[in-house]
Structure formats: structure tokens, C-alpha cells
Amino acid sequence: MRKSKTKISLNSIPGGELFDRVIEDEFVLTEKACICFMKQILEGVSFMHTKNILHLDLKPENILCLTKSGNRIKIIDFGLARVHEPHKKLQVLFGTPEFVAPEVVNFEPISFATDMWAVGVITYVL
């Protein structure tokens, strides 16, 4: 019988939070950069959803830039994430208020659309 092992992998990501990047005085957020960020965010969320994972705390503070000057990003902080099982009703009452979907506020069943609400807010913020 094999023992299961838990492994933790830590990466250094020196670019900082996407939120901090876009509010820097010297950073000019162009339409092209915004499209680049959103494309990666959508690809990341799509990948999570194919694995039936709901992030439930998507916000610019949970998106890190890989470098100080580049546009590559990583989605972080899966502390509130849940496995989505379509046949089971899942309700939550947590998240960052500015980014939570109406179904969270109303304590109604959540789904992939809950994360997509936050993606829409991120798009608006950018």
C-alpha cells in the first residue's frame, strides 16, 4: 500500500499584484495590455472550471504579475476555492464584497457563473 504525500511548491513571483501594477503612477494601462491580462485571466478561469474548481475570490489582488515589467500573470489564493459538483447545491457567504456575485450575497446556489461575475468586475476595474 502506497502512502500519499502532500507537497507544497512555492515560486518567487517578483512582479507584485496586478492591482498594484495598474495603479502605479508610471504604469500606463493600454488597451493592448488590458486585453493581454484579461485573456490570461479567462484562460486560467477556464482551466479551473474544466477541473470543476470554483475560485470564489477572484480580484486584482489575487492576480500576480510574473515580472515587474512584463504582462504575464498567475492567479493565486485558492483559500476559498471549492469543488463544484453540479448535482449538489453549494452556497457560500464569503468573498471580497466588491467582487462577489449576487448569488453569494443572497446565499443562493453558486456555479461557474459566480467566478465569471468577478471576472466581469475585474474587466471593469481594468
Language-model features and meaning:
Residues 115:
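Conserved catalytic-loop aspartate of Hanks-type protein kinases
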